[in-house]
Amino acid sequence: MLRKIRIALATVFFLCITLLFLDFTGTFQLYFGWMAKVQFLPAVLGLNLVVIVLLLALTLVFGRIYCSFVCPMGVFQDIAAWFSRLFRKRNPYRYSKPKNVLRYAVLAVFIVLLVLGFGGLAALLAPYSSYGRIATNLFQPLYIAGNNVLAGMAESRGNYDFYTVEYWMRGLPTMIVAVCSLVVVVVLACVGGRTYCNTICPVGTVLGFFARFSWLKPYIDAEKCKSCGKCEKNCKAAAIHIAKGEVPSIDYSRCVVCGNCLDHCKFGSLTYGHPSKQNNSPKTEGNKPADAGRRAFLTATAVATGAALVKAQEVKVDGGLAAIEDKQIPERQTKITPPGSLSARNLAQHCTACQLCVAECPNQVLRPSTDLKTFMQPEVSYERGYCRPECTRCADVCPAGAIKVISKEDKSSTQVGHAVWVKKNCVPLTDGVECGNCARH
């Protein structure tokens, strides 16, 4: 039953969040935009304490249900693993020892990058951001191509319910990052299920620590267990250890509460609930008390996280204006950020680099940055499009508050940069023709 509930909820969340990245009309944002705002990293960078407390509370009660069906990257791994099992006879899942050194090292690097202001690089490790880049750069072109085919077919029959949409590749670096992320995640999912979640993902590491103390969890009745190994072979988190002559154990820091073990146990030895003394359940790896080293590390992590949150609250408007040159199109020293971002510094501190705003921009004026410090975060590029004064789509969809919601009136009066007149490019001077476009626009 638990597995069926998980699959149903995971399907709803995954489809709705994916449609947020694919949709170019803004329709799905009205109904499902909140699903992006309840993702863990956007909530942390946006200082959304309600969502943070809610996710931690749910983890302390039910375990890592966030990783099970809320996180789109987690569900995407399950889909990839399911397809891989169609082409193999044996289930690849086996118990593996926890790689805690690697997990906490990646988490430490993630926090340090956030503290130092390299949010774009830190987002390369974040699950929601990684899936957003995959959906925006790899899935959305296919979605738009399908729409354009339908639009052409409908137009030939006199139906104009569909309309064609132009798509352009937003940069080679962002495409390479998306492809690499897709390959790494799919390979890890096909080989070991939730390996990414339990070795690389910083969100999984944080929630895994709290899940060790969850009130409800799957537990094994040692008296009923026959050590058949069915649960171990179907645990996609490699968290169940069953061995002859040994007490069966579950590592709750890695368990994602998928319910697979419950469905495959034929002896009724597995139960999802609160393990009490009356249940005579064995001690599990996930319930071992933390040693002094672990406590010291968690203390350091808490301090670093606090520093990151304090840093995220700094809002400085730095102008972001490029030096004006009258010789050629100037090289922008500071990238232009969307109205509502307050400043380049504020955008860099709060943006998760999920590229939802890039995917939703109707005029394709936003593109991912290639600068090291703001890598994959959005910047305004007028070389490909223009920003409509009445459009506030990027602010409406931003899940982390990096682009603040702004009224159309305020947007029209917000200066994001200066126009630069390049004399040698002015056709009235070079060709002697009438123009006046700059005055009209």
Language model features with spans:
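Non-ligating segments of multi-cofactor redox enzymes
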Residues: 1-254, 259-441
